[in-house]
Amino acid sequence: MKLWGGRFSKATDGLVDDFHSSISFDQRLAEQDITGSIAHATMLGEQGIIPQADADKIVAGLRDILADVKAGKITWHVDAEDIHMNVETLLTQRIGDAGKRLHTGRSRNDQVALDVRMYAKLACEETRQMLTDLLEALLDIAQDNLHTIMPGYTHLQKAQPITLAHHMMAYFQMFLRDRTRFEAAYRSADVMPLGSGALAGTTYPLNRERVAELLGFSQITQNSLDGVADRDFLLEYLSAASICMMHLSRFCEELILWSSSEFHFVEMDDAYATGSSIMPQKKNPDVAELIRGKTGRVYGDLMTLLTVMKGLPLAYNKDMQEDKEAFFDARDTLVKGLTVFTAMLRTITFRKDVMAQAASGGFTNATDCADYLVRKGVAFRDAHKVVGQLVAHCLNENKALLDLTLEELRSFHPAFDADVFDDLSMLACVERRRIPGAPAPDMVQQSIDAGRAAL
């Protein structure tokens, strides 16, 4: 008979047991469930709610079970439904009637809320560390490439010259914000719900603050309905994970393009590429492509939980059992993605000569040419028009701006002088952009220094 089966006259159908059971996936919460139960039993004994001798037996029994879980010695059972009932059943089998007192003042509703909050805190912490590792890799690459000229793009068209360091620091800022989002998700999860009961608290004099202290929570929930009814803290994790995967996917898209023969900006390390079963010459950026593909999977996990929660009346509903698989899948996908991406990034070879050559084409210095005229007193809109005409002329003549003679330039506007040629070199175009956040090497160095301080 089920632990809750007192009011039922027959056992649940086997089909229901199979459909209803969550032990296949919530066994992942075993350590959190047992640790939470140890804290709960400790508090019950301290408060005199159950005999201290029974509390001691429960704690000792749970610690033995926890050790067996870590050693892989436990077999979970579908007919016990979930991790909570599996642990309680096993405990009672091992220590006898004292185990029946464990659930005093507690419901599975607040118990599972506790478990997933504890797991979410761990997930946020590990993700934060992985992002820190990625941020350090970006800083290292940026530091080594302060003067590596490359084209910046808009609409995937060459736009203006920048540096590889500046490009890496753009992603640094994105992933730094991602880390901040996981820190915020941690704070949302760091609220202890035990004591909420099924929905209306309990008549027992529980010391909720003591349980929070034992489990390392900074505060307790302030409303028993809210304590069991919401999973917004998981949605915050899933949202942060989705945004982080989006940033990874964008980065991977660029690396995929850059590794192609059309760009040839990077060479993927052999350890992070694959071949073709039919084409002997192929070296495919499969790792980057898989991360890009798995991003949609994490989006799906977010939408799964949003959809589960959107129509639920207060308080707990069985629909909420569906939170865990989406959460676990997103966590696993993100962890694997961050781990392999950071390792891959550190092995990439950047072809600096190809990047520099690419920057010199496509009239990336056209804006600087217009700015040159502005410094000579020409209104910007007039300068813009003149340089546009110059570009059209160059296209007709198959020339770059720096290929034009001074006489040719002056035929478009008399403000051009001999110093224009120094101003239009790729390095000069970059070095003149010396406001905070711009690509001039000394400005990027300031960003790198600030980034290291932020870590």
Where is each model-derived feature located?
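A helix-coil-helix interface module used to build multimeric assemblies
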Residues: 1-201, 206-208, 212, 274-275, ...
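Short runs of predominantly hydrophobic/aromatic residues within well-ordered alpha helices
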Residues: 37, 84, 88, 234-237, ...
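Conserved hydrophobic residue
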Residues: 49-50, 74, 263-264, 379, ...
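Generic, well-ordered alpha-helical scaffold segments in large soluble proteins
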Residues: 40, 61-68, 90, 94, ...
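Short, well-ordered beta-strand elements within core beta-sheets of diverse protein domains
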Residues: 42-50, 119, 166, 235-243, ...
